[in-house]
């Protein structure tokens, strides 16, 4: 995980180190963000450690999440039947890593907040929309073609998929349900 939010990095480190024999290492990225990486205590992260299966690797493998590319990501089907509190934890973790909180500019002078999760995986975004419904929040899915410039040449990128929560009622409900780390805008909303 890479982030500039110290509380998010601390939370990630805390969770990884709950797995027996696991620790983390931190590196400073060129962007100024910090990268935190999971690894076994005695060396680099591998799928085997001390002759036994690495428990973190086993969890990731069990749910079919190992070695997935960004556009192949999805929520495992069994997660949709989790209790509501666990759904909230999952949504919090997803929003901490790839979610955003913005303020819309409005002609009335009011700038209402909205929340957005973005991915190149349509399936993941639709899965998140489905999880939001489990906690009584309606999100709208949209897509947008992206582009980038490489060596002066404009190229077409992947389609970006977004689930957006914009209704004041649903924004309030979602922010009340989530335990977010590292979102300055959430602190601004909650005062």
PLM region spans:
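Internal intein/HINT superfamily modules and their associated LAGLIDADG
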Residues: 1-191
